[in-house]
C-alpha cells in the first residue's frame, strides 16, 4: 500500500507540474504573439490578445484602452514602421516579464537609439490585462529636447499640422511623420 500511495503522489505532483507548465507556456506564447502583432503592425491580432479594458503604464503614466482605441494606437504606431525585438521573456508567479527593444522612424529622429524597456505583463484569463513599462535605456533629455525643437519649429513654419504630437490616430501619425520630414529638410 505504501508503494501505491507513493506512486499516486508522484503522479499527482507530475500532473499539476505539467499543467502549470502548460499554463505558463500559454502566457509566454500570448506575450510573444502580442509583440509579434505589434512588430507587424497587425491591429486586429493585437486587439484579440488584450482584455476589454486594457491598461498600459509607461514610466508611471497610465493609459486605458478599449479594443477600438488600442487598434487606433497600433495604426498610429504603424506609420513609423516599428521594430519590436524581444530581448528577454520569462514567466514567474503568473506575470510575464519582457525586455523589449523598440525603434522606428519617430524614435530614430527623437532619440537616435532604440528605446529599451522592461515590461511586466499581467493577464485576465487568456487575455493581456495590463503592461507596465519601465525604461531601461531611454535618454529623456535628448528625446524631450528633440521633440520640443520639432514642435516649436512646426508651430512657426507649418501651423497647419500643429497638434500632431497628441493625435494618436493614423492621420495624426502621418502628420507626425510629415513634421519630421519637413524639419529634416528645413534647410533645403
Which ranges hold each PLM region?
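Bacterial Sec-dependent N-terminal signal peptides
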Residues: 1-26
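Short, low-complexity N-terminal intrinsically disordered segments enriched in polar/charged residues
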Residues: 18-40
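Short, solvent-exposed secondary-structure junction/capping segments
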Residues: 32-36, 48-62
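Solenoid-repeat scaffolds in large eukaryotic assemblies
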Residues: 43-47
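Short beta-edge strand/loop motif at the mouth of beta-sheet-based domains
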Residues: 62-74
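Surface-exposed, charged secondary-structure patches
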Residues: 71-116
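Short, solvent-exposed coil/turn segments at beta-strand boundaries
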Residues: 92-95, 121-129
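Low-complexity, intrinsically disordered terminal/linker segments enriched in charged
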Residues: 131-188
Amino acid at each position: 500500500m505504501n508503494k501505491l500511495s507513493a506512486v499516486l503522489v508522484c503522479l499527482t505532483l507530475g500532473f499539476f507540474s505539467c499543467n502549470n507548465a502548460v499554463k505558463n507556456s500559454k502566457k509566454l506564447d500570448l506575450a510573444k504573439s502580442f509583440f509579434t502583432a505589434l512588430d507587424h503592425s497587425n491591429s486586429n491580432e493585437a486587439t484579440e490578445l488584450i482584455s476589454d479594458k486594457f491598461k498600459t503604464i509607461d514610466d508611471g503614466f497610465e493609459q486605458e484602452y478599449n479594443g477600438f482605441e488600442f487598434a487606433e494606437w497600433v495604426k498610429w504606431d504603424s506609420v513609423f514602421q516599428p521594430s519590436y525585438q524581444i530581448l528577454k521573456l520569462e514567466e514567474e508567479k503568473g506575470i510575464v516579464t519582457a525586455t523589449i527593444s523598440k525603434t522606428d522612424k519617430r524614435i530614430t529622429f527623437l532619440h537616435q537609439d532604440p528605446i529599451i524597456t522592461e515590461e511586466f505583463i499581467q493577464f485576465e484569463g487568456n487575455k493581456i490585462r495590463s503592461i507596465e513599462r519601465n525604461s531601461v535605456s531611454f535618454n529623456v533629455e535628448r528625446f524631450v529636447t528633440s521633440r520640443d525643437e520639432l514642435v516649436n519649429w512646426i508651430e512657426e513654419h507649418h501651423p497647419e499640422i500643429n497638434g500632431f504630437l497628441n493625435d494618436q490616430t493614423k492621420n495624426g501619425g502621418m502628420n507626425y511623420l510629415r513634421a519630421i520630414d519637413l524639419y529634416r529638410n528645413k534647410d533645403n
